[in-house]
Structures are given as structure tokens and as C-alpha cells.
Amino acid sequence: MPEGKLEAPSRTLVLPDLLRCLVLTWSEGRADLLRSAARNESWQATVNIDVREFLRNVFLLRVPLTFVDLPSVQQHDYSIWQNAAERTKDLSDSLVVVCGFGGDPLEELWARQLGAWAYLPGDNGLAGLELIFGDARKAVANKALVCVELDGYR
């Protein structure tokens, strides 16, 4: 390459085999399902059932994806779970996925106003969860690619 010419950065991005994500869910059964879906799409999930532990991990861990699995609106501590999602947006720059319990339109509106990257209107089973984890992996890769390209031109 002739001297004085800058080479544009490569558009090839190599991601680690397992990306890390943080998950908050309300039951052991859901935790197992979410862990499986994440693993099947190359995510290494740190799954929390306790909201305080989750918020501590949001603060301590820098992960590109955070998944908040909300309980039923009728559950007495539902607002605590919503608050956890809001704090996640305040404390991190990760993509936030909100999974609702039963497709409540007000819940979806709240998630959209929060700035959630994606909202799932209820239990989509393993295949639906794998789809969202796969899409998130692509979004994180694209975000990283943009950062790599911008850094290459400095």
C-alpha cells in the first residue's frame, strides 16, 4: 500500500462464541426456558429471579443485552419489576427486551415509551425467544461494526 494512504477498516467483525446477557424473570421454569433460548443463540445468560440481585448485576456487569421478563400485571409487586426495567435503561446502554405476561396494550405502550429495543407480548415459547435472542445478536454485531468503523477513521 502506498505511503500516506489510509486503508478503510474491514467490514468483517468477529464476535466471541458466547455473548453475555442479563435476564430478570419471575420463576425457575421461565429461567430455564430463557437460559436455553439464550444458549441456543450463543448468549451466555446471567439469570436473576431476585430484583435486587438483578439491579446489582446491571450496575456491576456491562452486557450488550438485558432481558426483563415481567410477571402478571395482577401480581402485587409488578411495579417493582417495571421499575427494574426503567433502572436498567438509566444504568446501562444495553439493548433492553421486555417480555410481557399477557399482551396488555398499556404494558406495550409503557415498554415503547421506555425505549425498549423489543417488546414481546407474552410467552412465545422457546422458538419465539430464540428468534429474539438471534435478532439481538445481529443488532449487537451491527452496533459493534459501526463503532469499529468509526474508530478506524479517527
What are these model-derived regions, one by one?
Residues 42-50:
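Short hydrophobic/Thr-rich beta-strand motif most characteristic of the beta2 strand and flanking loop
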Residues 49-65, 73:
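Acidic, metal-coordinating helix/loop segments flanking the phosphotransfer/catalytic sites
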Residues 64-87, 91:
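Conserved phosphotransfer microenvironments
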Residues 102-118:
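Alpha4 helix (beta4-alpha4-beta5 surface) of REC/receiver domains from two-component response regulators
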Residues 124-133:
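C-terminal output helix
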